[in-house]
Amino acid sequence: MKILIPTAKEMNTDHPCIEALPLKEESQAVLDSLAHYSASELETFYKVSAEKAEEEYAHIQALKDHRAKHYPALKLFDGLMYRHIKRDKLTETEQAYLEDHVLITSALYGIVPALSPMAPHRLDFLMKLKVAGKTLKSHWKSAYDEALRGEEVIFSLLSSEFETVFSKEIREKMVTFKFMEDKAGQLKIHSTISKKARGAFLTALIERKVQTVEQARKLSFAGFDYRPDLSSDLELVFVKQA
């Protein structure tokens, strides 16, 4: 059983560094493509300010020259979802569950265990980077599929641009989750609520060592309860009263 979570744009490097691992072949190819861009080209590529582009250029060059500082991925990323995941003061069994089941999907590193070393970088599957003539999605498809080959239960907390990297065969196994708010009888989906809920849901999975869809259906967390009337076999819907 594996749980997939995406990367985030926000990062926090206020953590102790850890030792880097050698880059996979696929990751090196992506890095080589990124390293061709000048700082001013990155400004256009990332659609960011000149100052931000300079920062990203420095990150890419540091990775290329093996100077980059690395951090556990789950602690490096600091978006809204990540800030709602229990990342510190885990019990031994919670830590073991996290290490065994939670995977981060990255457009640079591939699919890796949540505490794998990562260096600060900015890349997602909506970016139009060509790697040896292929799109990022095409470049990663077989490695992404291979990482989940043989897994029967796959919980996806990914957005659609990450899910579509996988083949149909893998996607058909994925259990997805929807988090909604009930405002006076009106069900609403809100990006902020969804991101916070994904983090709180993952925390509940970790704390209760969930292994099956049946166990996931029984969860109540952060005001959310499972709604069987809105759910299907492969999409579980949780609703919170506003």
What are the residue ranges of the model-derived segments?
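Internal, well-folded beta-alpha domain core
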Residues: 86-242
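Active-site helix-to-loop segments that bind/position phosphate- or nucleotide-bearing substrates
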Residues: 2-89
